[in-house]
């Protein structure tokens, strides 16, 4: 099981595909893990690995990665990723992130353009909004444990690996705190993203709204988008037959 010591973390990651292939780093969303097909890329990673050297990362506090800092921000997660890219000597990479993972990809495009060849942003925002805040207010771990014990147990199974039992509750609190105040990028920030960007969203996504996607499409100089009809937040999971080929086509055109 590969771990990398970066940014004071024991960061868990896995690799698929040819070792000499062009690197494609896949980032899961909040509460996701490498083996999660809804919050992560588990359903598409193997098909991507037929062509690319795929690196899947578990963010700080998630899955098998620890988080000694006791809090998390998107900048932290961007720094963690940059540290892994440097440690593995990957050079400039293609990044594809779901939800919060998409925000991390945007962060890297802004702060580490030297490491970012393209970004694929699935169901992510450039600025937090009332819909995110309303959902975050429902994510009380103690209430979840009472109302949906099976869901709470599954979340614990995924995120307490190698940690104290019940660590998943603190992770959930950290996710909520981060998303209530971040991200806060302006249109001026978006205009500074120099790499090609593919923006993917379901038309019914209440979090990554079409308004936010339209703003990013308009302001990021080399952006294109894919809006999938009758799809929600986990659009990659609901319609892998649409999202997967489009991601591969986008990366191939920008390699």
Predicted regions located by residue number:
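Conserved acidic catalytic loop of the alpha/beta-hydrolase fold
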Residues: 75-93
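Acidic catalytic loop of the alpha/beta-hydrolase fold
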Residues: 204-208
